Curated annotation (Swiss-Prot):
Keyword Endoplasmic reticulum: no
Signal peptide: 1-20
Tissue: Expressed by the venom gland.
Descriptive protein name: U8-lycotoxin-Ls1a
Compartment(s): Secreted
Amino acid sequence: MKLIIFTGLVLFAIVSLIEAQAENEKACLPQYQVCTDAPGNCCSDLVCDCYGRYKCGARIGRNCFCLQKGVIYKREN
C-alpha cells in the first residue's frame, strides 16, 4: 500500500515538473508583433511599447508592439 502511494506521489511530482517547464518555455513574441493583449510576452531583448490612436483629437484606440529597448521611433512626414 505504501509503495502505491509513494509511486503516485512521484508520478504527480514528475507531471508537475513537466508542466512547469512547459509554462516557462512559452514562445515569445518577435519584433514588431502586436502585444496589446500580452504585454509581458515579448522576447527578452524587446519591450512592449504602446501608442494611443487619435482621430480629430479623440482617442479611438491603442496599439502595442514588441520593439527594441531604448530605440525611439519618430514620425516622418
